[in-house]
């Protein structure tokens, strides 16, 4: 197992800069490269700008601002020869197969013989990424899928190909665990790997059934939240956080690579309501609001929620669903409650948990890996199989029928 003493990150967007920051936090020197800017004379302006944003971003990607000094900015036109100094090159560019493969060919010309190359892809299978690449490149290639923000989200999904050398895998696992403080989960080379494969279906059913069952945004989030061991953002708050406009892209990428027979294909429905929100710029926290927004009334900030029927905002209300109160007694009490909240909880949980169960061993060899991925990638308190245990496996199987 070789050591990683210098790293290159190619792509200085939100994820790339976050990964570079976490590597720097580990006391490792980082080269951060990006494309040339369209305007201006500073050819390194994009990477330099990313480093400056690290110093201002909240929550802070850097443990201390001095760690920024470990990051050397550059560009992919002038500085690819710097890769010869690096033990690990992490690609974090746009999710476009042609762009990634063209970059790999350039990386292969400059990397040293022992250097490992990884991709932070979340949707493109490893087998597609290395198609047409030489044997040595394939032997030193893997997927290292970080979650945003990289400093705070503990999951690192590690995917090896059939040609990836065992020592490459062990080096990456040790680096992720010991140096970056990650929970490293071995995944199979399947669409969305583990966390996003399950997470995208979960988000899809939670949104679709909220519309179908006539729940308000506040009611849905009160169910898809503490009662299920999911962060208080719930489902609609989570979409606001990650960016509503990203969902159609993630969904289309997933649909392009999923098997022909898959539950997600059956439940996926494009939402005209959400498409209209995106067109209006209501993309969540980074836009002019989303399912929630902060509005100023009489000099005070007021949290408002979107009406899923009218598309108008109103002051956000606490949920009065009796099922939420019942959920304090346990998960089964929640899903057995007869009100629309209890019915909604069961529809979301039954689809999500049965989907997760059906994917083993397709996406991972062990159910523990699935639980760890959802807990550390989506911040669930319990993984899918732990949720089944809380409900009771026999009870759950019987209720499904």
What are these regions (language model features)?
Residues 1-401:
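N-terminal glycine-rich phosphate-binding loop for ADP-containing cofactors
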């Amino acid at each position: 197992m070789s050591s990683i003493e210098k790293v290159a990150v190619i792509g200085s967007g939100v994820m790339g800069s976050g990964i570079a920051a976490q590597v720097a936090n580990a006391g490792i020197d980082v080269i951060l490269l990006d494309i040339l800017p369209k305007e201006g004379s500073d050819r390194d302006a994009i990477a330099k700008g990313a480093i400056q944003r690290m110093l201002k971003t909240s929550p802070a990607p850097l443990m201390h601002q001095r760690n920024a000094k470990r990051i050397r900015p550059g560009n992919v036109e002038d500085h690819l020869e710097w890769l010869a100094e690096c033990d690990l090159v992490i690609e974090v560019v746009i999710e476009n197969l042609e762009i990634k493969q063209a970059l790999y060919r350039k990386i292969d010309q400059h990397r040293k013989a022992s250097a490992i190359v990884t991709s932070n892809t979340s949707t493109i299978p490893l087998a597609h990424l290395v198609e047409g690449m030489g044997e040595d490149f394939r032997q030193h290639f893997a997927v290292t899928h970080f979650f945003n923000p990289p400093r705070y989200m503990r999951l690192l999904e590690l995917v090896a190909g059939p040609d990836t050398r065992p020592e490459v895998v062990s080096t990456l696992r040790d680096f992720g665990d010991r140096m970056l403080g990650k929970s490293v989960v071995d995944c199979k080379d399947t669409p969305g790997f583990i966390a996003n494969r399950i997470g995208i279906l979960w988000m899809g059913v939670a949104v679709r059934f909220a519309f179908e069952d006539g729940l308000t945004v506040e009611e849905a989030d009160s169910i898809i939240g503490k009662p299920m061991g999911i962060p208080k953002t719930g489902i609609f708050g989570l979409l606001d956080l990650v960016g509503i406009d990203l969902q159609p892209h993630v969904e289309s990428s997933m649909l392009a690579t999923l098997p022909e027979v898959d539950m997600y294909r059956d439940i996926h429905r494009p939402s005209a309501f959400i498409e209209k929100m995106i067109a209006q710029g209501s993309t969540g926290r980074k836009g002019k609001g989303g399912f929630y927004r902060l509005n100023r009334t009489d000099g005070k900030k007021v949290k408002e929620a979107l009406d899923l029927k009218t598309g108008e905002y109103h002051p956000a209300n606490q949920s009065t669903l009796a099922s939420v109160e019942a959920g304090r007694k346990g998960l089964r009490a929640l899903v057995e409650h007869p009100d629309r909240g209890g019915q909604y909880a069961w529809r979301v949980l039954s689809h999500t948990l049965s989907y997760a169960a059906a994917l083993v061993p397709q996406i991972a060899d062990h159910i523990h890996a699935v639980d760890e991925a959802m807990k550390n990638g989506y911040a669930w308190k319990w993984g899918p199989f732990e949720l089944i245990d809380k409900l009771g496996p026999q009870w759950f199987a019987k209720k499904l029928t």
